[in-house]
Each structure stands twice: as C-alpha cells, then as structure tokens.
Amino acid sequence: ALGYAFDFEWSNQNLFYGQYRRSASYYTNSEMASSGLTSEAELKYLEPLKDQLPPGVFTTEFQVPISDGSGNLRSQLRQAGALLSAAGWKVDANSRKRVNSAGESFSFEILLVSPAFERIVLPFKKNLERLGIGMSVRVVDPSQYVNRLRSFDFDMVVTVIGQSLSPGNEQREFWHSESADLEGSRNLMGIRNPAVDQLVESLIAAPNRQELIIRTKALDRALLWNYYLIPH
C-alpha cells in the first residue's frame, strides 16, 4: 500500500531531470533479474513453496505502481486506501488518521543520512498524509546513521542493496532468517520467511551458472512479491 504513495515518475521528472530508470528487481541490470511471467524452470523451485508465497508469484508479472508524472495520485491513493482498510487500518472519523482496531495510529519515522534526501521523501510524506499515515523525517550524521543501521534502530531508510553478478553465500546475510537479528547484517528488512530461506539455500547449492541464474530469479520473485521495500 505504501508503494502507491511514492510517485517515482513525478520525482524522476521534477527532481532528477528524467535521469533514472526505476528498479524492478533485487538483481537489476543483470541476467539474474526476473522479468515477465514465471518460467517453467523457475516454477520447479517455487511450486513446492506455493502455500508460503503470494499468489502473484505464479500468475502475474511483477510491476511497481506507475503514475503519469503529473503529481495527481488520486487513483493510486484510492487503491492504497482500499488495501489499508482491508488490512484493518481504517480512517478515524474525528482525527482523519489511519488507526487499527486497538486505536493505534499508523505512523513511522524515515531515517536519512543527508539533508539532500529530504526533497525526495517530503512529497512521499505529503501523499502518505492524504492516506491518514504519519511519517516523520529524521536526519542524522553518518556515524550515527551507520550505528543505527547496524542495530536495526529505524523504521524506514533510503538505501541501495548492491548485488554480486555471481550471488552465493552472502545471500544468507541479505535475506535469510538467521541474519534477521544479527547485528550488522545486511538483512535490513528483518526478513524471516521460511520460503525465502529455502530459496536462498537452493541458490547457494546451484551446481552451474545456468542453474544459478534460474534459482536467483526464483528468489527475486519471492522477494519482490513480499513487498519488503519500495523500489526506486
């Protein structure tokens, strides 16, 4: 739902002069990136985990929300609102804030390492406010930022997750449950997902390059469809 509130097309056009192409894979710009519908080769590793994965993995090409770049997100925000309501986050009639059944408001903090990022996240904040979601922005110095990332002391951050052209053992540190609480690991999303764990181990055990590509694409799909981040 939050992804619908990030207007990449408007930001790219108005803040970056159209210089960026949005990522749609954890392994973007490589032969490891998934695309289109799931292939038969990938299904070999995904089908046994069908009960643990979102249905879209098997039926639909993954796509991030796309706007017309005008800044008018009414349609996307309507979709986001429907998803939030379905998940139990209703708009309170008095405060106009999103609250759950316990009366808790939907709010979080985004942690930044540089004031330069504020111009990127403030339009996002404004769109979230229209949904009844509160987002505060905190900018800290580099040393504090690194320490807070290492100890997972944040709600949301803006970051880049760089990947090798030959993924291997290091994938456990990014996505595996065993790294979710390991201070200093690169599992910043705190992923604890048995299906993802299994796909990571399968990737590491790939006997050749072709199998590595197939298994990485399968993992990529599982990560994308679980919406652990908002691609930018």
Regions found by a protein language model. Give the residues of each.
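Append "and occasionally in soluble cytosolic enzymes with long acidic Gly/Pro-rich linkers
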Residues: 1-126, 218
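Residue-level signal for nonpolar/aromatic packing positions in well-ordered secondary structure
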Residues: 1-2, 84, 110, 128, ...
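Extracytoplasmic/peripheral linker and loop segments enriched in polar/acidic and small residues
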Residues: 12, 46-68, 73, 82, ...
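Residue-level detector of anion-binding/catalytic polar loops
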Residues: 90, 134-136, 155
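A local structural motif
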Residues: 94, 104-109, 126-140, 198, ...
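Short helices/loops that flank or line small-molecule/ion binding pockets
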Residues: 122-131, 143-154
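Beta->alpha turn/N-cap motifs
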Residues: 159-164
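Short beta-strand-centered segments that line the small-molecule binding cleft or hinge
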Residues: 167-171
